Amino acid sequence: MKKPQTQLRRLLEQLPCQSFVCGKQAYYYIENGLDRALAMPACVFLAGFDQLMLGYEKLDSLYLPREHLRGIFNRAGIVFPALLVEGAVAGRWKEEKKAIAVTLFGSLSARQKKAVLRGAEACWNKPVEWMAL
């Protein structure tokens, strides 16, 4: 929305909005009554060009740490399938013939790796092949 901040603030005040600050950025939402702890699984395999990745300014994403930006968005415009672990992009994935190839951007705890393994098994009934970055 290309409107002055004062005008946007007045509009937000008319809505039943809640807000929170992450870093130095304020985010607004309308409560939907869902229990957030139940709403998102520990591991989510997002598709390439998923709206969760495209719906935010890349540099301001709540889900994609800035240091992993090029691991998901390449300079040619490709958006790789992202692996979300506990609400943050932890790597990317690709379905291969016999396994799900997972490339991590950092380390995961044993509990987090188990969530990835369970997620791949539930979605594809295939094992995970851990790839180097």
Give the residues covered by each predicted segment.
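Long, charged, low-complexity, helical-prone intrinsically disordered regions
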Residues: 1-133
